């Protein structure tokens, strides 16, 4: 049986635009079409440096949807990378708190975590019509492992897109905060391995995030994360309004199929 060719991805134009600024994502997209989630599921990711406020803004968005828009709590999945599954949490501990990991091994560990997380958690929730709010996604790998390490963004983008079978969020919120301000927010105590890297590393990461956003303005919303969190929250709401129109908050998720041995 011949294999059916995938339909052109709705995000194709944005990826073509990325060729001018981020050849990594563009070159890989020629071989792995980036595909959006199913029509009734919505995927929103939050990106930025450590301490930019991603977790806070993700939680505020979730609370707003539940209290102000009456979205059922079980329709909203909040998750994080690395992590999000028992396997992922083990990988997270190794990556963030373990000993030195060689760059290629580090990239492969992040990709393994993401592949398992997307296949077992994110895609099933999207397929049931749910809303996924993610604290970091593959953009973080391109920024941290690509710009800040010894590997190129092209290599990291290719590995990351392969791991998730081309899945991209409907909207990516980039909370941009100057590197020096992030360092002050984190403080000297309790830093993990990545947070303890020098200012030069984190500046390279920030610049790569901004480059990715410039290359893909349809997916990205860049928000000044230095402002009061309520102001940032208001801009987050405005930036996700369009993609949330794809999400029907009255839709009841279809239960996942039962295994034969459960019937």
Where are these regions (language model features)?
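A glycine- and Lys/Arg-enriched "phosphate-lid" helix/loop adjacent to the NTP-binding pocket
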Residues: 140-208
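Pre-Walker A (Motif I) flank of P-loop NTPase domains
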Residues: 39-43
């Amino acid at each position: 049986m011949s294999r059916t060719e995938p339909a052109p991805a709705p995000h194709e134009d944005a990826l073509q635009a990325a060729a001018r600024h981020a050849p990594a994502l563009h070159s890989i997209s020629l071989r792995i079409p980036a595909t959006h989630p199913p029509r009734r599921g919505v995927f929103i990711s939050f990106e930025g440096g450590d301490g930019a406020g991603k977790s806070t803004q993700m939680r505020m968005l979730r609370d707003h949807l539940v209290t102000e828009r009456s979205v059922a709590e079980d329709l909203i999945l909040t998750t994080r990378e690395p992590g999000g599954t028992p396997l992922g949490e083990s990988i997270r501990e190794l990556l963030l708190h373990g000993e030195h990991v060689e760059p290629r091994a580090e990239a492969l560990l992040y990709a393994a975590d993401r592949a398992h997380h997307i296949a077992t958690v994110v895609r099933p929730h999207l397929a049931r019509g749910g809303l996924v709010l993610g604290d970091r996604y593959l953009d973080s790998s391109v920024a941290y492992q690509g710009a800040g390490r010894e590997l190129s963004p092209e290599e990291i983008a290719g590995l990351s897109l392969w791991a998730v079978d081309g899945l991209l969020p409907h909207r990516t919120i980039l909370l941009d905060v100057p590197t020096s301000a992030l360092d002050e927010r984190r403080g000297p105590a309790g830093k993990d391995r990545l947070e303890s890297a020098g200012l030069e590393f984190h500046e390279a990461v920030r610049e790569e995030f901004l480059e990715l956003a410039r290359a893909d303005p349809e997916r990205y919303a860049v928000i000044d994360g230095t402002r009061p969190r309520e102001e940032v929250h208001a801009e987050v709401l405005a930036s996700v309004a369009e993609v949330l129109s794809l999400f029907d908050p009255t839709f009841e998720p279809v239960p996942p199929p039962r295994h034969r041995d459960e019937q």
